[in-house]
Regions:
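Acidic, Ser/Pro/Thr-rich low-complexity regulatory regions
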Residues: 1-164
């Protein structure tokens, strides 16, 4: 059995030490519906607000351990999350600017991690072009071609996801 697609997001949240929220609970429900069944996963699926972060951080660690989900390679976990977000963008479920915003923030959080820096640059190129004719982040990007540049970059990134 393969974990549900949103597992990439949950693992990224864990390695980035994000607060537990409804996204985690929804993921736990999805996992149960997909046939995964552990005691702690069922407990997580039954949680509701307000969330006790101390208790839930411990619970989610147990859930991920029970499901044998690997968190040892932080960079690969983040790359998998980028693949998840890009996939959602390419099928129209998530706006590409929102994807760039999320990955730009992670890039900053991770001290301008090299493998995320293009997302940072594309975010600010598109942002600048939303109110100006000029941008200095992505060579050759204009208002006329920024969407294609982003889509091509996402498509290329996704093709690399499939080889990992």
């Amino acid at each position: 059995m393969k974990p549900v697609k949103s597992t990439a997001e949950i693992l990224a949240f864990k390695v980035l030490n994000r607060d537990i929220n409804k996204t985690w609970v929804d993921w736990a429900v999805e996992m149960l519906m997909a046939g995964f069944d552990t005691e702690n996963l069922a407990i997580l699926a039954g949680e509701f607000e307000p969330y006790n972060q101390f208790q839930l951080q411990d619970l989610t660690t147990k859930v991920l351990s029970e499901l044998q989900l690997d968190l040892t390679d932080k960079d690969q976990t983040i790359k998998n999350y980028a693949c998840f977000l890009i996939d959602k963008s390419l099928v129209g479920e998530l706006d590409n600017f929102k994807v760039l915003d999320i990955l730009k923030d992670i890039c900053i959080e991770l001290d301008y991690e090299k493998y995320l820096y293009d997302f940072y640059s594309l975010y600010f190129a598109k942002d600048d072009l939303s109110y100006s004719e000029n941008q200095w982040y992505w060579d050759g990007a204009t208002r006329e071609n920024i969407e294609k540049i982003i889509t091509d970059y996402f498509t290329n990134w996704k093709s690399n996801c499939l080889t990992n």
